[in-house]
A protein has these predicted regions:
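Basic/polar N-terminal segments that are highly enriched at the extreme N-terminus
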Residues: 1-19
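Active-site-proximal loop and beta-strand segments within enzyme catalytic domains
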Residues: 3-7, 22, 29, 58-195
Length: 198
């Protein structure tokens, strides 16, 4: 049985305003009515209690399926702050060292290769060299790991990323990590900042 968070009888019981919370709901409903978004779920909690929980619009507009409060979403880059906070909490507990090599936790990231820029356009695959040091957890948190998006990888690596189907919604995280571990990094770990979802 899933854990149920306690609910406040009314928002004012935890120091929030019902009319102000209604403004959030109204603004989202306006976007739903305009077709800007299909639906949304909002939850506002304070002092350990849920003050407001709303499911608005549709989880599947075409099928007419209403949004539910437990509908699951892909939240894209919003996972980054959650992941960073979780990593810092694990570090505080001594269960994760930020300076550790990623391969300590994900063996597929050991012995990575790094693409080397080349002016020789006659080759189909990028030249590679071994990474000078292992990718660290810190590198992942600050986007200096050498991993990147296919469209940012440059002409040589772009096709490698696309051919490997790194982004495939049907694969498991383990399958994706295996693919990433076989691809060359775009730069040496710790040397260059590049926004990445990995």
């Amino acid at each position: 049985m899933p854990f149920e968070f306690p609910r406040a009888d009314k928002p004012e019981d935890v120091g929030l305003s019902s009319p102000r919370l209604a403004r959030i709901r109204d603004a989202l409903q306006t976007d739903i009515d305009k077709g800007a978004i299909p639906g949304a779920v909002t939850l506002v909690a304070r002092r350990g209690q849920i003050a407001s929980l709303d499911a608005l619009g549709y989880r599947d507009r075409e099928a007419g399926a209403a949004m539910k409060s437990d509908t699951m979403f892909r939240i894209a880059s919003m996972t980054k702050p959650f992941t960073s906070v979780a990593a810092m909490m694990l570090a505080e507990e001594g269960r994760l060292l930020i300076a550790d090599p990623v391969s300590r936790y994900i063996p597929e990231f050991a012995n990575l290769e790094v693409a080397v820029d080349s002016d020789d356009r006659s080759v189909n695959k990028p030249k590679t060299e071994p990474s000078r040091r292992e990718m660290s957890v810190h590198d992942l948190l600050r986007h200096t790991s050498g991993l990147t998006y296919a469209h940012l990888a440059g002409p040589f690596l772009k096709s490698d990323y696309e051919d490997a189907r790194v982004v495939d919604e049907k694969q498991t995280n383990a399958e994706m990590v295996g693919k990433l571990g076989r691809l060359p990094l775009t730069y040496q770990p710790g040397t260059t900042y590049a926004w990445s979802k990995w």
